[in-house]
Amino acid sequence: MWAKYAEEDKFPAAGGDYDEANMKDDAPGKVGLAKPEDVEYLLSFPQADVEKIDDAASLMHMMNANTFTCGAFRLKDAADAESVAADVKEYVMNKQWMCGFPDKLIVASVGGYLVEVFGDEELVNTFRDKLAEAYPDTVIVSEDPIV
């Protein structure tokens, strides 16, 4: 997805997690699942649902993750998409934010993946549009302002 962005649409970004091998500058990076609490802290993905995924990646705004955070999660069972999406939405909507307040949350389903993106409305909308363009079978499960 990030490679499809025009230069004028890009922002300072990084991907990955706390493991140096997974950290990427200006690109998405792998997120390890061995520590569910890290997945929750980095991506606002509920710890209890980490057992339902077998791979994850992230892309975040380098200056402030609340400006843009995206997580892509491969579900072990695609039938869990609806319940995991609901859990993600509930978690994000009830989070106590620091250092900026994100405008919008989108949770989408693409094949066996769940994609969560929150942050500045313009950045989130751009990502949503590029996701739908790249993957026409994308289903927007929820699209909500964060209040």
What residue ranges belong to the model's regions?
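Soluble, non-membrane globular domain cores that form compact, hydrophobic packing
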Residues: 1-69, 75-147
